[in-house]
Amino acid sequence: MLSFLSSNLSSTRQSLAQVLNFALVLSTAFMLWKGLSVFTASSSPIVVVLSGSMEPAFQRGDLLFLWNRSPRAELGEIVVYNVRGKDIPIVHRVVRTFPQIEGKAKKVKEVTEASSVPPNMLLTKGDNNIADDTELYAKNQDFLHREEDIVGSVRGYMPMVGYVTIMLSEHPWLKTVLLGIMGLMVILQREQ
């Protein structure tokens, strides 16, 4: 009887240790993500290119590293933005800037680097697209606000690494298979 209680206690202890290890892995990943978010000043410091609109600069599945500490975006800079009301990151190039004058947007010629007017409003376009992004913006929005809409500027990338994310979102059954394999590995590891 005592050996039964001892083995039960040992099994419970092992299960608790596995749960705590799993929680430790999750909390470490979360803390690293939040730390990276604070360091880059971006709510999403790493994003995956979801379409071919930026080819040949970036391919679908490329993993992008963002930085959002620059107060202004320059012409030609590649930025990631979210459309208001939607949570889909769009990666496109700044093709025009508009200075903010008395709270309203005023179209002017493209701002050059020598200009002293801070460009707070941007127009973007995918390198592989024919037209600019005004059709993608929210209703009654003709430009992006640098402070409100921009998630970050691209500072680096890793080709094709993000394709796993795309495959998992396009084929939901792969998530089930992956979770099943992970669960099977936990069960098999426990038996050893």
From Swiss-Prot:
The lineage of its organism: Eukaryota, Fungi, Dikarya, Ascomycota, Pezizomycotina. One of its GO terms (cellular component) is signal peptidase complex. One of its GO terms (biological process) is signal peptide processing. This is Signal peptidase complex catalytic subunit sec11. It is found in: Endoplasmic reticulum membrane. The active site is at 53 (charge relay system), 92 (charge relay system), 133 (charge relay system). One of its GO terms (molecular function) is serine-type endopeptidase activity. The chain crosses the membrane at residues 19-39. Residues 40-192 are lumenal. Component of the signal peptidase complex (SPC) composed of a catalytic subunit SEC11 and three accessory subunits SPC1, SPC2 and SPC3. The complex induces a local thinning of the ER membrane which is used to measure the length of the signal peptide (SP) h-region of protein substrates. This ensures the selectivity of the complex towards h-regions shorter than 18-20 amino acids. SPC associates with the translocon complex. Residues 177-188 are annotated as: C-terminal short (CTS) helix. Keywords: Endoplasmic reticulum, Hydrolase, Membrane, Protease, Signal-anchor, Transmembrane, Transmembrane helix. Residues 1-18 are cytoplasmic. Its main location: endoplasmic reticulum.
